[in-house]
């Protein structure tokens, strides 16, 4: 595809493996990024969405990427919003999955995570998959967040960053590239009506709702979603 050589898709690693492989095989240059403190990346986690957007820009500059297609899920949607707010000239297309322009987090969940309590992970798994038990390759959260230290140093920091991000309603107005919004009909973490409101705030956008799917779209319905995203990217 002509556009693929100029565009790179950015995913967080591991949870995106089924999607990443598919797009690589379709001749897209796929870049899977572990944020600082996550996966194979060293250093402490970045504690604000704004800092993450700035860090992503440094990565793209370092790699000399002129144009990128960003694909993000949940917290990643906030990161994409803030990136658009600051660096939209680099953007070619955006794909938002299971997210909104604001993502307040239950204080009880934050408290559990800050205390390194494994119940924080159990709660997240319950909310991620409630009403939908069909996902491919097992539940990834157990594999990614394994110890009380991980819960304190990674999960808690990410939850607070999401909770504290308040610029989304302004940032969404800066989006002027083609955008796709994907939501799971059974998502308990991002209400479908909230999601639709988010999508309607962007003029040049398309929305796809996946039946029988919860929050973890790219795992629960990997095969369906990658075909839909490919269709959007080829337009």
Question: What role is predicted for each listed range?
Answer:
Residues 1-7, 11:
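Single conserved hydrophobic/aromatic residue that forms the stacking wall/gate
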Residues 9-20:
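The serine-hydrolase catalytic nucleophile loop
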Residues 17, 25, 29-72, 227:
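Active-site loop/oxyanion-hole signature of alpha/beta-hydrolase fold enzymes
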Residues 78-122:
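Flexible "cap/lid" loop of the alpha/beta hydrolase fold
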Residues 111-174:
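Conserved alpha/beta-hydrolase catalytic His-Asp/Glu region
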Residues 175, 181-183, 187:
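Short beta-strand/loop motif that positions the catalytic acidic residue
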Residues 177, 191-200:
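Short alpha-helix in the alpha/beta-hydrolase fold that links the catalytic acid
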Residues 213-226:
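Catalytic histidine-centered segment of alpha/beta-hydrolase-like enzymes
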